[in-house]
Design a protein with these regions (language model features):
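Membrane-integral, polyisoprenol-dependent glycosyltransferases
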Residues: 1-326, 461-488
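Membrane-embedded architecture of ER/inner-membrane glycosylation machinery
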Residues: 157, 269-493
Length: 493
């Protein structure tokens, strides 16, 4: 049953992957910018909606380009590599658990704990830098661990190369996170290893290889790039108001359904002095500690520590300690999520067939309580991908607006304006630049919020969401109440 669940999770990662429109605003940046990269052949300078976008290095765009090349410029192609790298990260975590414990069973439990955690799964279904960043950092740490434990010298340069790839996703943090984890671990366990010159030579090479894009942009864009780099990397260190415990509190939601089990697992590792889990413990503590000290706190920042959380949680579940307590936690998780699913189906008027799945975690609990949280995770995924998001998709009309614009101006010869609001996914679906914050000129196509532009009559109207789709729960609540929706017209001016 354990391996059946793992195969089912792998299947769920790709089912309905392309069924949902591009999420606005974040995913839209990568969807449109990569489409333009394939058109103009410039894979170094990302342009979103005709404007240079230097917020992140190009690796995420390149990954999307691979998906587009394989499956076409569509939602499935947009997200394919992210789903693949999400599973890849879980697979590497499985291999790491096997390396640490010698048990494939521990590996598969780690695979399930990571791949089914809510935040990690959600980001694996969504084109953004977080999953590629986590993948390359996890790969870097795994290759280093193999080098250190088995003495395979050729793996050390590969570990640093993986760190360079992480830098091409999100900049210097791609070096700081794996290097800091290894440094602290060796400082505590084997300080003499830190005296080896190879680490410092490879660090210089990794930084040169990983930061070439930033160097190129400094040389070619100068102050423009420095301004963006400061905002994206340095300003966040001191500009923010969240409390220092923000990430530990957020973990209760982001690592569901295993979050309730993780905190006792962490306590268990510390009390029992499980030396084989010293490495994931340092990994978790360093990343959570570092980002807790940074002023601006965003939940996905600590996602590179999630494989460590999965390793610690799976070890606790498979141990023979605290059996009654673990059974209690597993039952509570199953009960709470089952009640939440029941509430969601009734509250959002979803397909009642979802309710037929509610007994499954409890049936699995009777067979093996350790598998119940995985079944709970699968239940959450099914609820999201086959009930909640399809119901929400009915209220997302930006793709229809884009198709209508292409019908009005098939040759893309007219400028297109949006007045009264800007929908970030519209440039992708209209396949052209959308001019914003400007007075429309004659001979143009205008998308406008009704009563914000009175110089032409709409040929067709659409009801569109005006909030951020990235805040999914708020979007769901707004959709239910028809809140933050407005009527938009499209006209030939």
């Amino acid at each position: 049953m354990l391996y059946v669940l793992a195969l089912l999770v792998a299947l769920l990662y790709f089912l309905n992957l392309g069924a949902f429109q591009v999420w606005s605003p974040n995913e839209a940046f990568y969807a449109d910018s990569t489409r333009r990269m394939l058109q103009n052949g410039d894979f170094i300078n990302p342009y979103y909606n005709g404007e240079l976008r230097l917020n992140k290095p190009p690796m995420t765009y390149w990954l999307v380009a691979i998906g587009y090349s394989l499956f076409g410029v569509n939602e499935f192609g947009l997200r394919f590599m992210h789903a693949l790298l999400g599973l890849g990260t879980a697979f590497i975590t499985m291999l790491m658990a096997k390396e640490l414990t010698g048990s494939w069973k521990a590996g598969v439990y780690s695979f399930l704990a990571l791949s089914l955690s809510v935040q990690f799964f959600a980001n694996s279904q969504y084109a953004s830098p977080e999953v590629p960043f986590t993948f390359f950092i996890t790969l870097s740490l795994y290759l280093w661990l193999l080098y250190y434990k088995r003495g395979y010298l050729f793996l050390l340069p590969l570990a640093f190369f993986a760190s360079s790839l992480a830098m091409l996703v999100k900049g210097p943090a791609g070096f700081v996170l794996p290097a800091g984890t290894v440094f602290i671990y060796l400082l505590l366990k084997d300080p003499r290893e830190l005296l080896k010159l190879r680490y410092y030579i490879l660090s210089v090479l990794a930084l040169l290889l990983g930061l070439w894009w930033q160097a190129y942009q400094i040389f070619t864009k100068g102050g423009l790039f420095w301004e963006v780099f400061y905002k994206e990397n340095l300003r966040r260190v001191y500009h923010g108001s969240e409390p220092i415990y923000f990430y530990l509190a957020d973990l209760n939601v982001s690592f569901l359904p295993y979050s309730l089990i993780f905190f006792p697992a962490l306590l268990w590792v510390l009390i029992k002095l499980k030396r084989e889990y010293a490495f994931p413990l340092v990994w978790f503590a360093f990343i959570y500690g570092l980002f807790s000290l940074i002023a601006q706190k965003i939940p996905v920042y600590v996602m590179p520590a999630f494989p460590a959380l999965a390793l610690i949680t799976s070890a606790f579940l498979l141990s023979e300690d605290w059996e009654r307590f673990k059974k209690f936690l597993s039952f509570v998780v199953s009960l709470l999520v089952a009640l939440a699913v029941l509430f969601a189906v009734l509250f959002f008027s979803l397909n009642p067939l979802i309710l037929t799945l509610l007994p499954l975690p409890f049936l699995l609990f009777l067979r093996d309580y350790r598998l119940a949280p995985a079944m709970v995770g699968i239940l959450i995924v099914v609820l999201l991908k086959f009930a909640l998001l399809p119901s929400l998709e009915e209220k997302r009309k930006v793709r229809e607006v884009g198709e209508f614009i292409k019908m009005l101006d098939a040759k893309a010869s007219k400028p297109v304006y949006e007045v009264g609001h800007f929908h970030h996914s519209l440039p992708f679906y209209a396949e052209r630049r959308i001019i914003r914050d400007s007075q429309p000129e004659r001979g143009s196509v205008v998308v406008f919020r009704l009563n914000s532009f009175n110089d032409c009559e709409p040929v067709r109207t659409f009801r569109l969401y005006t909030g951020s789709e990235s805040r999914l729960f708020k979007f769901l609540m707004d959709a239910r109440k028809d809140k933050n929706f407005a009527d938009f017209g499209v006209c030939l001016y």
